[in-house]
Amino acid sequence: MILKKAIEDAYKHGYLGKNILGTGYNLDVYLHRGAGAYICGEETGLLESLEGKKGWPRLKPPFPATSGLYGCPTCVNNVETLAAVVPIIQKGGDWYASLGTPKNGGTRLFCVSGHVKRPGTYELPMGIPLRSIIYDYAGGIKDDRKLKAVIPGGSSVPILTADEIDVKMDFDSVAAIGSLLGSGGVVVMNEDTCMVKALLRISKFYAHESCGQCTPCREGTTWLKKTLQRVYDGDARQEDLDHLLGIAFNMMGTTICALADAAAMPVRSYIQKFRHEFEYHVKHKCCDVEAAVRV
C-alpha cells in the first residue's frame, strides 16, 4: 500500500506519466505483487514470473542487463539498493563510502531476530562488530541467557558460534571466518536452542521452496530434510551424519541458481560446529538440551 500510494502521488504531482514536468518525457510505473515464492528472489526467476511463467531461474549469460524482461535490457535491483541511491545523490558517493570500511563502504540493513530483547531492523555502517549489533542495538540475549550461535546473513549462510561474534559485519571480514554477510538477516540463538531442530526447520524451508528445475537441488533438498528428520526423531545412524555432509557437498555449485548452495551450506556448518549435538540425538534418541526453546 505504501508503494502504491507513492506511485499515485507521483502521478498526481506530475513526476510520472505523460510529458513529465513539461519535458516531453514519458514514464509509467507499474506495481506487480508476487505470490511470495522464495525462488523469485533470484533475478531471472523473478523475470520469468513477471512474464507469467513458472519462476524458474534462467541460465546466465545472457544477463538481464542485456536480455531480461521479454528479451529487453532490464535493470533488476533490491529495494535496499534503490533506497541507498537518494542519499548518495544528495551527499555524494565519497560521503556514503566513508560510513563503512575502506573496501566495504556505506550502510547495511541488519534485521535482527531470535532470542534478543529488541528484535528489529537497524541501518548501521558496514564493518560494525556483530557483538555490537546483538548487545548494543538488539539489547542482548532475552532473559539474560548465554549466547550459543548466530546466523549472520540469513538462513542460507554458515552459522557462527558465540566465540566468533567479534567479527566485523562487512563482506570481506565475514567471508574470512568462513561465512557470508548475505542479506544481513541476523538470527540469534541462546544456550537452550537445539541445533538439530534449527537445521531441520531450515532444511524443510528449502525443500519446500526449491523450484524443482535442477535435479541436485530438487532431490538434494528432499534428502537433507528426510535425513535430518530421522536424526531429530532418533531414527538415524551415526553414518547418516556423514551422508548428510556428502549430499550437501554434491549439491554445491551444480545448479542453475544458488538455492542448492543455500540449502547445503547450513548443513555443513551446523554439523561441523555442533556435531556433538547431532551425535547425541543419534545415540540417545533425544536432545541434549534439557529445555529446548522454540526456533
Question: For each predicted feature, which ranges?
Answer:
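Terminal amphipathic helices with adjacent charged low-complexity linkers/tails
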Residues: 2-7, 29, 142-176, 272
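Hydrophobic alpha-helical positions that pack around
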Residues: 3-126, 138
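Ferredoxin-type iron-sulfur electron-transfer modules in oxidoreductases and energy-metabolism complexes
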Residues: 5-23, 166-295
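Short amphipathic, charge-patterned alpha-helical segments
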Residues: 126-144
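Extended, hydrophobic alpha-helical segments in both membrane/secreted and soluble proteins
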Residues: 130-133, 146, 210, 224
